[in-house]
């Protein structure tokens, strides 16, 4: 480890292999907390490279609990959190809606980072079991087209870094790792990041990790596609990254103020999500979900463009199909596979 630290102290970047080695030691609990604090701080001050982020992600995936990966195509929709704007749970709600649209979704999530309730806080409130075994989760994915993978169930080693992360009280490499370490390893992915300068590096990281199709987005201050302004996109397709901007108009949607998708406490967010899933969401809530599910339909080849994809999502929302799916998931999640 000290060899890796000396490289960083000289202002140089670590290779992917070196970072993989360093973070392998971290998640195995072999690194003294003071040394770990130095590692995270040195990386942060230098600025983490895509190779370093990929190496750390590979280390965590290598130590993760196995998930029985299916041979069909499936996706994840996830944000880093940490945008500080406390909006409704767009990615969690979108995951349920995407499944209601016929996609297969294995969503990786954790307790809250940015909103008052993260994906796990919301699922808990909806009666969906968080600590499903990998076999149970796979059963839900096969039968219903959706499962939720609760990060601590798969990445137990990350607990070794928790005291240091809490003591540092600043963002570190761990803040961007969560969305990159889905143990199911989805075939395509929509990932939101909390800062515009992360869009390109995280897309490069996903490409380095072998993702074939995906989008990394930052929406005017949010770690998701915005309905209140433009969204910066880095699209991964056929081994290449293309960068562009999209606006609500590209989806055929109105523009709304960000206050229209303000979130609340876990119970309030559960009520908001329940209303959206049942076809009783506000126009702004529905638009936020449509904008974030539409790219997944496009990536899956189930829509020709963003406008027709968003229209399909709005139709599924109006049908209340997603509420039915959430209720079935709550029941199935408590049954043995």
From Swiss-Prot:
Binding site for anthranilate 2: 165
A Pfam family of this chain: Glycos_trans_3N
SUPFAM superfamilies per the UniProt record, alphabetical: Nucleoside phosphorylase/phosphoribosyltransferase catalytic domain, Nucleoside phosphorylase/phosphoribosyltransferase N-terminal domain
Molecular-function annotations in GO: anthranilate phosphoribosyltransferase activity; magnesium ion binding
Binding-site residues, Mg(2+) 2: 223-224
Binding positions (Mg(2+) 1): 91, 224
InterPro entries membership: Anthranilate_Pribosyl_Tfrase, Glycosyl_Trfase_fam3, Glycosyl_Trfase_fam3_N_dom, Glycosyl_Trfase_fam3_N_dom_sf, Nuc_phospho_transferase
Cofactor note: Binds 2 magnesium ions per monomer.
Enzyme class: transferase
Keyword Transferase included in the entry's annotation: yes
Annotated binding of anthranilate 1, by residue: 79, 110
Catalysis: reaction(s): N-(5-phospho-beta-D-ribosyl)anthranilate + diphosphate = 5-phospho-alpha-D-ribose 1-diphosphate + anthranilate
GO biological process, one term: L-tryptophan biosynthetic process
Binding site for 5-phospho-alpha-D-ribose 1-diphosphate: 79, 82-83, 87, 89-92, 107-115, 119
Gene3D superfamilies membership: Nucleoside phosphorylase/phosphoribosyltransferase catalytic domain, Transferase, Pyrimidine Nucleoside Phosphorylase, Chain C
Role this protein plays: Catalyzes the transfer of the phosphoribosyl group of 5-phosphorylribose-1-pyrophosphate (PRPP) to anthranilate to yield N-(5'-phosphoribosyl)-anthranilate (PRA).
Subunit structure: Homodimer.
Family: Belongs to the anthranilate phosphoribosyltransferase family.
Name listed for the protein in its UniProt record: Anthranilate phosphoribosyltransferase
């Amino acid at each position: 480890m000290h060899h890796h630290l000396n490289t960083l102290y000289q202002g140089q970047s670590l290779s992917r292999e070196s970072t993989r080695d360093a973070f392998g030691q971290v998640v195995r609990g072999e690194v003294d907390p003071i040394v770990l604090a130095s590692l995270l701080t040195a990386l942060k001050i230098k600025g983490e490279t895509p190779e370093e982020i990929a190496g750390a992600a590979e280390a965590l995936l290598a130590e993760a609990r196995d998930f029985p990966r299916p041979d069909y195509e499936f996706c994840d929709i996830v944000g880093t959190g940490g945008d500080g704007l406390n909006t409704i749970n767009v990615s969690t709600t979108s995951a349920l809606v995407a499944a209601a649209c016929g996609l297969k979704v294995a969503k990786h999530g954790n307790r809250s980072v940015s909103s008052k309730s993260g994906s796990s806080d919301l699922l808990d409130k909806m009666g969906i079991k968080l600590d499903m075994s990998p076999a149970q989760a796979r059963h839900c994915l096969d039968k219903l087209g959706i499962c939720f993978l609760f990060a601590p169930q798969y990445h137990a080693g990350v607990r070794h870094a928790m005291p240091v992360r809490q003591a540092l009280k600043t963002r570190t490499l761990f803040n961007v790792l969560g969305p990159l370490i889905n143990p199911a390893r989805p075939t395509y992915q929509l990932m939101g990041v909390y800062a515009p300068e992360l869009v390109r590096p995280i897309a490069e990281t996903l490409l380095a990790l072998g993702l074939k199709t995906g989008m990394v987005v930052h929406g005017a201050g949010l770690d998701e596609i915005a309905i209140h302004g433009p969204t910066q996109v880095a699209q991964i397709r056929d081994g290449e990254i293309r960068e562009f901007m999209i606006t609500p108009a590209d989806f055929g949607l109105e523009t709304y103020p960000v206050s229209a998708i303000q979130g609340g406490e876990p119970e309030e967010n559960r009520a908001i999500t329940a209303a959206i899933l049942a076809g009783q969401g506000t126009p702004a809530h529905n638009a936020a979900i449509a904008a974030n599910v539409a790219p997944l339909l496009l990536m899956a080849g189930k829509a020709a463009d963003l406008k027709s994809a968003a229209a399909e999502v709005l139709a599924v929302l109006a049908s209340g199909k997603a509420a039915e799916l959430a209720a079935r998931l709550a029941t199935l999640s408590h049954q043995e596979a």
